[in-house]
Amino acid sequence: MVRLVHIVAGMAVAMCAVARAEIMPVDSVQVTLPDSDSVQVSAADRYVRLTERDYRRVADELGIEVATIKAVSDVEAGKSHIGFFEPGKPVINFDRAVFARRLRRAGINVTKARGSHPAAFAKIDVRKYGSYGKSQYARLESGAEISDVIAKESTFWGMFQIGGFNWRKCDVKSVDEFVELMSQSEAMQLELFARFIRSNGMVKYLKAKNWRAFARAYNGGSYAKKGYHRRLAAAYGKYSKQ
């Protein structure tokens, strides 16, 4: 469903013909629905938590149990199942190893990049940045100064921690569109998860509760070392009883 969003709050939007516009925070947005009705929606409401109805809708579309989706979220995002660090900023994990590998593949000198942008390769520093989330974004922003596309592709996004390098498997046209959708809502993060596992043939593993096969496909060859399959099974056992 396409929705047209117009900013109606009184805060300024600085625009320049030769530079990217900087969008300032707004108190509310006017949402125009296809039937031409308009409703006023607060900025906070745009990032409302996932509901049982959201889970049920996607589970029914995929032909799987709600508990299997919650199990994946539990393992990837933690028991809080939070998709956003703050409004407009999804929870992320900037992977330095993936970043360095993709830089080399693009012909970029990693040693020079590390010297000019040390923050992109630094360990998480909560004391310096104030929180885990801010520290992750500091690394992403520093990496983006080297290569915006590679930095986004080297980051795992949202409550299902989908790697940016998988954007093509999420039915989007670019990594920028992928990030834009990830930044919209937890419901959109769930939708991208559904697209991702459908395009990769992983739905059958969730249907069969084949946690080992799903963990291998979703998390890669190191899944066993980190016990992903056991954690998924345990999380499913918990949610299937609710």
Segment roles from a protein language model:
Residues 17-23:
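Boundary at the C-terminal end of the N-terminal hydrophobic targeting segment
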Residues 23, 28, 35-242:
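Catalytic glycan-binding domains that act on GlcNAc-containing polysaccharides
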Residues 6, 17, 32-35:
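Generic detector of low-complexity/intrinsically disordered segments
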Residues 2-10:
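Sec-dependent signal peptide recognition
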Residues 12-15:
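Repetitive helical segments and hydrophobic/amphipathic motifs
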